[in-house]
């Protein structure tokens, strides 16, 4: 049913939540965004503007379902998933492989990005070979990618300032 409605399915996230709720792990504060909310969030961000070639980030990715929801509606973007839980990172990698997403998955606390634990590049050769792939990300690649994300955020912030000159400036 979900595949018909949304064109994506997160079996790993559903299984993880079912198992963790039985073990009392909800005390850790881990709840995945419901599928219909992921779809709604993506729909709320839609404009007539082209949505390809962008870098889309989820700093608390869980099983990657918000990125999956974005991917099925906006193909051709680079997805960056981050989570402090290694199991969640591994589920996101699997989901990205299954759904043909290109990007990276970073295992770290996104509130302390200098503490890189691990990372993976997902499907970077998919467009050339048609074969899904995963490879370990080096810490140097992580730092380069992180700097790119920070630069993009600065540019977007500046663009917002220019669009709203009579409004209070963003910090």
Where are the regions a protein language model picked out?
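S-adenosylmethionine
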Residues: 95-98, 102, 106-171
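Conserved aromatic-histidine-acidic binding/catalytic patches
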Residues: 3-4, 29-30, 80
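A short secondary-structure junction motif
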Residues: 18-23, 44, 48
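Short, functionally important structural connectors and interaction interfaces within domains
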Residues: 23-24, 76
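Long recognition/docking surfaces used for binding and targeting
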Residues: 1-21
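Conserved S-adenosyl-L-methionine
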Residues: 34-122
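Class I SAM-dependent methyltransferase Rossmann-like catalytic core
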Residues: 24-33
């Amino acid at each position: 049913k979900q595949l018909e409605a949304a064109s994506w399915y997160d079996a790993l996230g559903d299984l993880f939540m079912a198992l963790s709720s039985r073990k009392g792990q909800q005390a850790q504060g881990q709840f995945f965004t419901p599928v219909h909310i992921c779809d709604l969030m993506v729909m709320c961000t839609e404009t007539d503007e082209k949505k390809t070639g962008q870098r889309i980030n989820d700093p608390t990715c869980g099983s990657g379902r918000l990125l999956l929801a974005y991917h099925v509606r906006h193909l051709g973007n680079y997805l960056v998933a981050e989570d402090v839980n290694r199991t969640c990172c591994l589920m996101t990698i699997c989901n990205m492989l299954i759904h043909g997403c290109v990007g990276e998955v970073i295992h770290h606390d996104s509130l302390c990005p200098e503490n890189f634990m691990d990372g993976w590049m997902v499907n970077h050769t998919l467009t050339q070979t048609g074969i899904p792939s995963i490879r370990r990300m080096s810490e140097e690649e992580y730092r380069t990618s992180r700097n790119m994300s920070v630069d993009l955020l600065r540019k977007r912030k500046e663009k917002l300032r220019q669009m709203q000159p009579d409004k209070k400036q963003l910090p």
